[in-house]
Amino acid sequence: MESRKGIKEVSMNFLDQLDAIIQNKHMLEHPFYMKWSKGELTKEQLQAYAKDYYLHIKAFPKYLSAIHSRCDDLEARKLLLDNLMDEENGYPNHIDLWKQFVFALGVSSEELEAHEPSEAAKAKVATFMRWCTGDSLAAGVAALYSYESQIPCVAKEKIRGLIEYFGFSNPEDYAYFTEHEEADVRHAREEKALIEMLSRDDSDKVLEASREVTQSLYGFLDSFLEPATCCHCHKA
């Protein structure tokens, strides 16, 4: 009995550490999103962000596929598949919803597709992909959890800012955020359960994945507040 209690305490402590890492670099605390919440971003900054974020939006289903294809646990695969289907199934799917947001900012389809992603955007995607294709499935799921667990409150605040400060009135224009405000509550809950289910003496990798992902998210957002941001805005 004592042994089981000990195992549970270690597990809870491990998951608490994971959440602490995420909270320490929560995206809502980043100056870029704080400016978004206060209406202090320019339209050009939002356009640059929307175009550069597109690389991650397109890659997200691949992160899920990389983990799903290597997972032997049937129940875990079902949860991963549900998340993947949420991303890609139906019309509009999540990529389509992101495009609706981009177009509402005045960016054309041609401009979006021709955009050359920044080094920060590439680094973020590479970080996710490295963990999702690595030798620890739990660490791969932790990379996703470190992102998706933040999204519901981030999406809610983004919607408020878009309506209050940036003239968004058509719900279709911010439907991407509405969808994720709801769906990622479930995704994060399932991912946390998967981390505990799949973890095999690799808690250090799980925590390292979270540290690297949260740092890459901050690095990406940093790039829109630097003097070089204007380069994002004028790239094709």
Swiss-Prot record:
The keyword Iron applies. One of its GO terms (molecular function) is oxidoreductase activity. Fe(2+) 1 binds at E87, H94, H180. The record marks Y33 as: Side-chain cleavage. Keywords: Iron, Metal-binding, Oxidoreductase. Homodimer. Involved in de novo para-aminobenzoate (PABA) biosynthesis. Acts as a self-sacrificing or 'suicide' enzyme that utilizes its own active site tyrosine residue(s) as the substrate for PABA synthesis. The side chain of the tyrosine residue is released from the protein backbone via cleavage of the C(alpha)-C(beta) bond, leaving a glycine in place of the original tyrosine residue. Reaction requires O(2) and a reduced dimetal cofactor. PANTHER family: 4-AMINOBENZOATE SYNTHASE (PTHR40279:SF3), PQQC-LIKE PROTEIN (PTHR40279). This is 4-aminobenzoate synthase. It comes from Chlamydia muridarum (strain MoPn / Nigg).
